[in-house]
């Protein structure tokens, strides 16, 4: 259950409509997912979040779009964000992720989680070669 109520007709606010229109244009889709409807309860939060998402996730960069979605999905799994897991897994699939890639991705996430817990519990000292200053 949400902690806020999504605005009934958010696009009557011109600032919200501008964000939603930009989302539609950027994604080449008429679909506005619930995240944006619920963030519309606060126009400034909506604008800032979309600005950051657009900058990081949609602009050409050194990482390809599928890799970005997989990173986002991995962090979402680590943070137990069910909504984000679903939305970014769907986005990864739309960017070409296969079932085999998804299975491999989940194996890596699982392995990283397990070894992170082991190393946190054991408090293994960090090798000096892994420090940036040693490079």
Model regions and ranges:
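Hydrophobic alpha-helical segments
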Residues: 1-135
């Amino acid at each position: 259950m949400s902690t806020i109520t999504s605005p009934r007709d958010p696009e009557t606010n011109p600032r919200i409509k501008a964000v939603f229109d930009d989302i539609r244009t950027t994604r080449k889709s008429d679909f506005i997912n619930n995240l944006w409807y619920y963030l519309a309860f606060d126009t400034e939060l909506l604008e800032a979040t979309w600005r950051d998402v657009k900058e990081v996730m949609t602009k050409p960069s050194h990482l390809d779009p599928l890799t970005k979605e997989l990173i986002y999905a991995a962090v979402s799994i680590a943070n137990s964000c069910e909504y984000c897991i679903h939305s970014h897994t769907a986005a990864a699939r739309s960017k070409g992720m296969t079932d085999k890639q998804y299975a491999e991705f989940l194996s890596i996430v699982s392995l990283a989680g397990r070894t992170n817990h082991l190393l946190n519990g054991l408090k293994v000292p960090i090798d000096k070669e892994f420090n940036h200053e040693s490079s």
